[in-house]
């Protein structure tokens, strides 16, 4: 599982010209599942570990002396979270100029996995959680804050 975390002042997702999700200050995260995750990934500790890591990242400013430091989590800051499914996080560009996506998870199990991840994150933190639509051609807009962009990989963090 891979997550590209971006701290934003605002973000939104449109599908077919209609807004399906929007947030104010918080995190917009692109979420992808790989073949190495497999259809049972939601049963492994790394699945919940990634949800906890995302919700607990201290990438927001504190108060006073800590105003310019990464001090508070999304929940402490009172921000919002937008999760966007993104299979292209598993692009393989080693050969030629056209990326291969054979390392991306099979949509048959990756779609319910994404929906379950949204549910787990929503249940585990008190912030507003919104999401894009799996498999849709989405227009994603965001305004980076910082910018702050962080890469989370379940293999690197949890060994699975």
From Swiss-Prot:
UniProt short sequence motif Gly-cisPro motif, important for rejection of L-amino acids, positions renumbered to this chain: 146-147
Source organism of this protein record: Desulfovibrio desulfuricans (strain ATCC 27774 / DSM 6949 / MB)
HAMAP family reported for this sequence: Deacylase_Dtd
Protein EC: 3.1.1.96
GO molecular function: D-tyrosyl-tRNA(Tyr) deacylase activity; Gly-tRNA(Ala) deacylase activity; Ser(Gly)-tRNA(Ala) hydrolase activity; tRNA binding
UniProt similarity note: Belongs to the DTD family.
Subunit structure: Homodimer.
Chief localisation class: cytoplasm
Subcellular compartments: Cytoplasm
Domain of life: Bacteria
Catalytic activity: glycyl-tRNA(Ala) + H2O = tRNA(Ala) + glycine + H(+); a D-aminoacyl-tRNA + H2O = a tRNA + a D-alpha-amino acid + H(+)
Annotated Gene Ontology cellular component terms: cytoplasm
Secretion signal, residue range per the UniProt entry: none
Principal EC category: hydrolase
Pfam family name, one: Tyr_Deacylase
Keyword Hydrolase among record annotations: yes
Any Gene Ontology biological process: D-amino acid catabolic process
The protein, known as: D-aminoacyl-tRNA deacylase
Note on domains (UniProt): A Gly-cisPro motif from one monomer fits into the active site of the other monomer to allow specific chiral rejection of L-amino acids.
Alphabetical list of InterPro entries matching this protein: Daa-tRNA_deacyls_DTD, DTD-like_sf
Task of the protein: An aminoacyl-tRNA editing enzyme that deacylates mischarged D-aminoacyl-tRNAs. Also deacylates mischarged glycyl-tRNA(Ala), protecting cells against glycine mischarging by AlaRS. Acts via tRNA-based rather than protein-based catalysis; rejects L-amino acids rather than detecting D-amino acids in the active site. By recycling D-aminoacyl-tRNA to D-amino acids and free tRNA molecules, this enzyme counteracts the toxicity associated with the formation of D-aminoacyl-tRNA entities in vivo and helps enforce protein L-homochirality.
